């Protein structure tokens, strides 16, 4: 089963818009110029999907096939630079949008793996790569340890979303739209709970004794 084109497009636009704005804000916190802001926004929004497509041999890359998405991301980045205080005050909204973006990208990653007849493990891996690697690249370019590696249950949500989506659409053979909506609801709800209650994985701290 495949998600219909309209659903894919809608989800993708939501995802890249949210991630583009969060990327722009991250660049602003590090006092980057306009080129830096736009570049970080682009990397955040389409970096994970690009890595996934290269690894899976899925061509052309989505933004190459639809360059209008680049324009949309640039626009969202510019909007974020004009109203940073408004965006910051709407923290709850953007945390929600970020959660939606994470789960949306995870669903799309899993679906592309499914379209290529890959199994469960590759579908979940594609979900994680699509969902979190844009943020990893963003943090590396901003010269900080990626948040996904140290504080938050972020990759875990991508794993859960990919696993749920694959299970529903392949093993239970439910309608694609139903699978998408269920995965989106569960994934976003879990992510927001993790933020509210500050859930995190155990931290490994090692100090070498001299």
From Swiss-Prot:
It is a multi-pass membrane protein. InterPro entries: Gly_transporter. It comes from the Bacteria. The keyword Isomerase does not apply. Keywords: Cell membrane, Membrane, Transmembrane, Transmembrane helix. One of its GO terms (cellular component) is plasma membrane. It holds the Pfam family Gly_transporter. The chain crosses the membrane at residues 31-51, 60-80, 94-114, 117-137, 153-173, 175-195. It is found in: Cell membrane. Belongs to the UPF0126 family. This is UPF0126 membrane protein Cj0593c.
């Amino acid at each position: 089963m495949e998600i219909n084109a309209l659903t894919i497009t809608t989800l993708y636009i939501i995802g890249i818009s949210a991630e583009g704005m969060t990327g722009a804000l991250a660049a602003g916190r590090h006092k980057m110029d306009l080129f830096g802001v736009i570049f970080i926004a682009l990397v955040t929004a389409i970096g994970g999907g690009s890595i996934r497509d290269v690894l899976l041999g899925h061509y052309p890359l989505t933004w190459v096939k639809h360059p209008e998405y680049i324009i949309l991301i640039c626009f969202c980045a510019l909007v974020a630079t004009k109203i940073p205080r408004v965006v910051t005050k709407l923290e709850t909204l953007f945390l929600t949008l970020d959660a939606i973006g994470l789960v949306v990208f995870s669903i799309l990653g899993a679906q592309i793996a499914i379209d290529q007849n890959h199994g469960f493990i590759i579908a979940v891996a594609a979900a994680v790569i699509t969902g979190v690697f844009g943020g990893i690249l963003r943090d590396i370019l901003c010269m900080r340890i990626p948040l996904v590696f140290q504080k938050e249950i972020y990759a875990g949500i991508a794993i859960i979303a990919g696993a749920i989506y694959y299970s529903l659409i392949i093993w239970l053979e439910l309608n694609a739209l139903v699978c998408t909506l269920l995965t989106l609801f569960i994934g976003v709800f879990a992510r927001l709970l993790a933020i509210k209650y500050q859930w995190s994985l155990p931290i490994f701290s090692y100090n070498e004794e001299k």
